[in-house]
């Protein structure tokens, strides 16, 4: 979840609109990292778990921005967003897939369509 926070709050930086996430006026970064009031922001439980008090939470949150998001992470988030896939652990994806009763990640491609293993996978997964 916090990786997605970082992805969103760094979008204006990656786009060259600002030099730092705090410089973008519509970002939640100033609330999350600097403690500025914003009636539009409702802190997520994962954010609240960063520390027991607001000052330490903000310090910890700012520290998350010391490291860049990897190209793979950026690609994974973009793919999930653009293709309506679910992003998360295997357990989380399975849970969501069961609740929605539909595939929420890319289908397995290729394979020998005449093989018993392929036909069984199709029967089980509907792929």
Give the residues covered by each predicted segment.
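Short Pro-Cys-Gly-centered "Cys-loop" motif that presents a nucleophilic cysteine in a tight turn
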Residues: 1-127
């Amino acid at each position: 979840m916090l990786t997605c926070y970082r992805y969103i709050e760094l979008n204006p930086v990656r786009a060259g609109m600002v030099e730092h996430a705090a410089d973008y006026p519509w970002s939640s970064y100033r609330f999350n990292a600097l403690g500025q009031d914003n009636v539009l922001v409702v802190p997520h439980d994962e954010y609240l778990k960063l520390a027991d008090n607001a000052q330490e939470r903000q310090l910890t949150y700012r520290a998350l921005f010391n490291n860049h998001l990897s190209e793979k992470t950026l690609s994974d988030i973009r793919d999930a967003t653009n293709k309506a896939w679910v992003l998360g652990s295997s357990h989380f994806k399975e849970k969501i897939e069961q609740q929605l009763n539909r595939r929420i990640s890319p289908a397995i491609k290729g394979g020998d369509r005449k093989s018993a293993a392929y036909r069984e996978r199709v029967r089980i997964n509907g792929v």
